[in-house]
Amino acid sequence: ALQNHNVSISGGNDRIRFRMSAGLSREDGPLITSKDKYMRKNISAFVSADVNKWFTQEVNLLYTDADKTNPVNVGNMSGFYTTRLVGYYPEGNIPGSILGIEDDLPSQTPSNMLRLAPVSHLNTAVTRVSTRSVFKPLKDWTITAEYTFDKKDADSHFYSERFRFADVQLAAKWSVESGQDYYNMQDTQKRYNAFNVFSNYDHRWGDHSFKAMAGFNQESYSYKSFYAQVKGQTTPSVPSFAGGSGDKSITDGYSEYSIRSGFARLNYAFKDRYLLELNGRYDGSSKFPKNDRFGFFPSLSVGWRLGQEKFMEWSRTWLDDIKLRASYGSIGNQNINPYQFLSTMTVSPSTVWLDKNDKVNVISSPGLISSSFTWETVKTINLGVDVTALNNRLQMTFDYYKRRTDGMLADGIEIPGVVGTSAPLQNIADLSSDGWELNLTWRDRIGD
């Protein structure tokens, strides 16, 4: 069953506007059990205020808290999705006299396994704060500053427990062998910050229309994780990491990266028929070595509204507009994991026993790195035509494109196995593609 409860309020006047909302959602999972559940609580608020004629401030807040539980198949359970077993083996308990023991045990049916299954718990909390400041120092000129902060924390814990049942061959089994029951907990933290500031100028002089925009962008992202597991709980009713008597394992992880960019755009139109747009980005990413972090990515597009020319007046009765366009652009791709340009060594426990029954740590060979490691560049050429006809009822768009990716990061060389590590990533691969796309749309109305 799914339940949603929401409440909202909004209001304001000429200078201040606001809205607030809250919600509660409950949902049962597909399995018929109280162990499979999801619940989410959320609240949001938005305020926009015209402080004066030249300054407007906006604030947006969002908080979400979600809890999820679900049964987990562990050890010898053999799953609770095998519904075919229901027709062959009875629900309830198998008499101990048949099993050769004193106690009656539940049979290994999906229903029993689901009823006895241990439960995993996950809590996720998300906080988002964003602000927007708009300044209007002069007519046709605006300056906008934006900031966004995202925070996501996830915490989970699980205990495998131990219970006894009768398997399909009428043998008494434990779900987890003695001393192999385990308790684990995991915590992850994600943080994201983004700052944008840009300026727009929009003006028209007679037949000339001019727009200009320039700005700065900076983003940062960090990820932190912690995972711990211990076997053999001394107090199963209150599982904990400190209460484990068996093997313990702990792992953690951390990564971060930042992006810094400058960008600009220039638009010019003459009589709204001859169109020109110039774009440029200068992007830097911490995912690349210090001397190769920045790249410049320009683009250009032109358009001609042919249907607005005088020599096309003969087609006005059926042709509403026709536009020819062409563009060339390049963008950078940095969709890789951080630290790929660093040579690292991994430390892990050995499976080899030495004197005094002690294990030693093993350090892997350092990875190879390449001096060629920077942005991938995606270049695209596009030719297109837009047609509107028959009183805007028929619309057609046709595009032909050619795309090329230069300097794709790939394993550029073959490394002998005796080296003990993999080949380094290099900007050594290229990829080309081309194609066309046609889109036809008909819009009409029949009757009233």
Regions found by a protein language model. Name each.
Residues 1-6, 76-113:
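Acidic, glycine-rich flexible loop segments
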